[in-house]
Amino acid sequence: MTDTTTDTASTAPTAVAVLTHIVKSIVDDPETVTVDEVADGPKTRLDVRVGPGELGRVIGRRGRTAASIRTVARAAASKDGVDIDIEFLD
């Protein structure tokens, strides 16, 4: 299984790398983490998939961990000059 699944012309390589690193450091089984990059109008959507039972750990209490991850990934995406949305999927 690949760590990140993107097309060859990634629009947000820095954001994908940062997001993958952060999520892998949170979950118990980092091999199950994938990040898919999807063009979604003017923004790029990053779909983060984690293993079974890991989504709660990534989202955190009241969504604080997910909000923090989104903030850091958006800052990394600004280096790439793109706007991103992040979806956490089970």
PLM ranges: what are they?
Residues M1-L55, S68-D90:
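RNA-contacting regions in translation and RNA-metabolism proteins
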Residues G60-G63:
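Glycine-centered tight-turn and secondary-structure capping sites
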